[in-house]
């Protein structure tokens, strides 16, 4: 958000502003120690893939996808830490009307942190929470509701 960007509308689904599961203290400490000397060192993410969607086929496809990595480098970890803080601090600078979509049972990201970020927005905004839905809303039982919310937001006046 350093350079001016003209956006008509923004749609954000399950933003990673904080993870929705505890990161072991030893991983955080190791990432801090290793970052300057071995930034490419990687750790397993520890995601519970059964929490991506209520549809077991989503987990199966995720595991079979050769482009999906189950690890994160310490460089990427620290970049994400800084980006999360930056996104939270700069929330009031977002001026485009913003739609936030989250599943209430998302355990991949922190829904509470997403709602806190949403509360910092000063632009026109709407938050749609999908009760019982997991992380990948577009692959969950609420898919049609999500598509309607996106369509309605995209076509809304203003």
Residue spans of the language-model regions?
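Conserved hydrolase catalytic core segment
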Residues: 1-12, 18
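Hydrophobic/aromatic beta-strand patches that form the interior of the parallel beta-sheet core
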Residues: 11, 99-101, 128
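Helix-rich cap/lid subdomain of alpha/beta-hydrolase
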Residues: 22-63
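Acidic catalytic loop of the alpha/beta-hydrolase fold
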Residues: 70, 105-109, 136
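Active-site nucleophile elbow and catalytic-triad environment of alpha/beta-hydrolase enzymes
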Residues: 72-90
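Short beta-strand/loop motif that positions the catalytic acidic residue
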Residues: 94, 100-102, 106
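Short alpha-helix in the alpha/beta-hydrolase fold that links the catalytic acid
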Residues: 96, 110-119
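Catalytic active-site module of serine/aspartate enzymes centered on a nucleophile-bearing elbow/loop
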Residues: 124-158
